[in-house]
C-alpha cells in the first residue's frame, strides 16, 4: 500500500513540474561586446596630414574585428517526409494420420482418430510523417570573438513588443569573412553551428502551453 501511495505521489509531482524559465530581454549572455580601444592619436603638429583623420584606402565596411556588427538574413526552410509500410504473414499446417491396429483404424464412437493443426498470422502496418519549417527575416548580431584562422563568432538577439506579448529572435554561430557581402550581410545558411531561436512571451504564448493537470495525464510515466 505504501509503495502504491508513493508511486501516485511521484506521478502527481511529475505532472506539476513547471516549464523552463521564461526568456527575458537584456540577457547578459546576448549583450553586445564592445570593440577594443584604439591607440590615442598623436598630438597635431601643424602638418596637413593628421593621424586622427587617417584611413585605409583599401579597407571595406565588412565586419572583421571584435565588436563589429553584421546583419544576418534568415532564410531557413526545412522539409522532412517519411513513410513506412510493413506487411508480414505466416501460415502453418500440421496433420497426424489416424492410428491403426491390426490393420484397422482405431475409432472412438465409430469415428477414426485424427489430428490436425492449422495456424495463420498476419500483420499490416502503415506510418507516415511530414514536417515543414520556414523562417524569414533579418537580425543584426555582434562579433564576440575572432578566431586565429580569421573566422568570426557572432551572437545577438532582437526583441519586438507586439500588443501584450513579446516576440524575440536569438542567433549564435560562426561565419567566414569571405561569405560576408559588400553590404555587410550574410545569409543564415552560411552560419556554421547556428543556433537560431524564435519564440515569444505573453498571453498569446501562454495559451499555447498545457496546464499542469494536462501535463500530468500526458507525461510519459502515465500507465494508460
Curated annotation (Swiss-Prot):
Residue numbers with lipid attached (N-palmitoyl cysteine): 16
Q: tRNA-binding: present as a keyword of the record?
A: no
Annotated signal sequence is 1-15
Any Pfam family from its record, for instance, is FlgH
Q: Where is the lipid attached (S-diacylglycerol cysteine)?
A: 16
Keywords from the UniProt entry: Bacterial flagellum, Cell outer membrane, Lipoprotein, Membrane, Palmitate, Signal
Subcellular location, record wording: Cell outer membrane; Bacterial flagellum basal body
User: Record's Gene Ontology CC terms?
Assistant: bacterial-type flagellum basal body, distal rod, L ring; cell outer membrane
Q: Which GO terms describe its molecular function?
A: cytoskeletal motor activity
Function (record text): Assembles around the rod to form the L-ring and probably protects the motor/basal body from shearing forces during rotation.
Can you tell me which family this protein belongs to? Belongs to the FlgH family.
Q: What subunit structure does UniProt give? A: The basal body constitutes a major portion of the flagellar organelle and consists of four rings (L,P,S, and M) mounted on a central rod.
Q: What is this protein called?
A: Flagellar L-ring protein
Q: Which organism is it from?
A: Idiomarina loihiensis (strain ATCC BAA-735 / DSM 15497 / L2-TR)
Gene transcribed to yield this protein: flgH
